[in-house]
Regions:
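Alpha-helix C-terminal capping segments
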Residues: 22, 29-42, 63, 292-295
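Charged helix-capping and loop-helix junction motifs
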Residues: 116, 144-149, 175-184
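Conserved phosphate/ATP/ADP-binding segment of small-molecule kinases
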Residues: 171-263
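A short helix->loop->beta-strand "cap" motif at the edges of active sites that frequently abuts
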Residues: 155-160, 234-238
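Conserved post-catalytic alpha-helical subdomain immediately downstream of the catalytic base
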Residues: 250, 265-335, 339
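Conserved N-terminal subdomain of the carbohydrate kinase-like
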Residues: 40-134, 329-341
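Short catalytic helix/loop segments, enriched in acidic residues and glycine
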Residues: 10-30
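Positively charged, low-complexity intrinsically disordered leader regions
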Residues: 1-13
Length: 341
């Protein structure tokens, strides 16, 4: 885990002198939805011992209702370990957001399966869902093994596995063969597999539509074909899903989703949403989808709730969302912004 530093008032980083800081990670962005709605959640991570940033992260997780477990690693001096810094502005109008990840000495790269009691976590504690991010799987050789062993243990105990591919070219450079094997094995045991068109093509080698671009609604059949190809390669996956995003401006996006649950397709045609900050919207979609799965909802309801969670987080300054209740999220899906008194 790390922190995100964001200029106030949507200003660019290079001319700002006033910033806000939040704890962040793709995984905790996902589970914040369930935590906010009262489900028990935990993140497996690692901390720098005695670091005020580590304490800031712990405090932030606590206010969200997220439990945490992980080793305290000695910093090792001023050039040793630390928590990553994600420096990102929100953009405005036609000025796009810019993100700079500073991961030098990131303590998360030391995550080791030996530091966790998997029999307790999946057996005694009875974790229902394990969510993995490709960001962590690709951080280092150790974290790749960590995610792989977590997936194997979860499968052994019957825990559902969710895997968001989250491909990052800079993480993969020079490690393509190693990471392709790890990602493919995790995907083969996953129950829910998430990724955009770039993720499926570059992480798993499955052909799909051109990444980004305009008129994304016209590419829905291409997305479906990509998912069907993924289903042939990974027949044990129960749910394949991808979000659709077309950027009109930094403040306005077209937001949609496609999901194949068993043999049932659910398609949310891209709809206009207003955006305060885009980071975390995809994670919130996954969080809403998984919340619905744990609650036993049908496939369509899960996807609609996930879409609305993503739209909800786009209205927030934080990368994560803590819904007041399910009604708030379903109100977004229904397009009902009337004041509630």
């Amino acid at each position: 885990m790390g922190v995100r530093i964001t200029p106030e008032n949507r200003q660019p980083v290079h001319i700002s002198n006033s910033f806000r800081m939040q704890a962040t990670s793709a995984e905790t962005n996902v589970i914040s939805i369930s935590a906010g709605l009262g489900l028990k959640t935990k993140v497996l991570t690692t901390f720098v011992k005695g670091s005020p940033i580590a304490q800031f992260i712990k405090n932030d997780l606590g206010r969200r209702g997220i439990d945490y477990e992980g080793k305290e690693v000695e910093q090792g001096g001023p050039w040793g370990y630390r928590h990553q810094f994600n420096i990102a502005d929100s953009g405005f109008g036609l000025r796009a957001p810019r993100v700079c990840n500073d991961r030098a000495g990131e303590v998360g790269r030391t995550l080791n399966i030996k530091d966790f009691d998997l029999d307790r976590i999946f057996g005694q504690d009875g974790a229902q869902v394990l969510h993995l991010s490709g960001l962590v799987a690709a951080l280092s050789h150790e974290t790749g093994v960590f995610c792989l062993e977590l997936a194997r243990a979860a499968k052994k105990y019957g825990t559902k596995i969710s895997f968001d591919l989250n491909y990052r070219a800079s993480f993969w450079k020079g490690r393509e063969a190693e990471l392709s094997a790890i990602f493919s094995e995790i995907a083969s045991v996953a129950d829910v597999l998430i990724g955009n068109e770039e993720d499926f093509q570059l992480a798993l080698g499955i052909k799909g539509p051109e990444a980004g671009g305009k008129d994304i609604a016209s590419k829905i059949e291409s997305f479906k074909a990509m998912i069907m190809e993924a289903k042939k390669r990974y027949p044990n996956v129960e749910v394949f899903t991808t979000t659709l995003r077309e950027v009109v401006s930094a403040n306005e996006h077209l937001w949609g989703a496609i999901s194949l649950d068993g043999d049932k397709w659910t398609v949310v045609e891209p709809r206009t949403i207003r955006v305060i900050d885009r980071i975390g919207g995809g994670d919130a979609f996954v969080g809403g989808l998984l919340y619905g799965k744990v609650k036993g909802w049908d496939a369509e309801k899960c996807v609609h709730f996930g879409w609305a969670c993503g739209a909800f987080v786009a209205t927030l300054l934080d990368d994560f969302g803590l819904p007041a209740d399910e009604e708030q999220i379903f109100g977004i899906w229904e397009g009902n912004a009337r004041v509630r008194r």
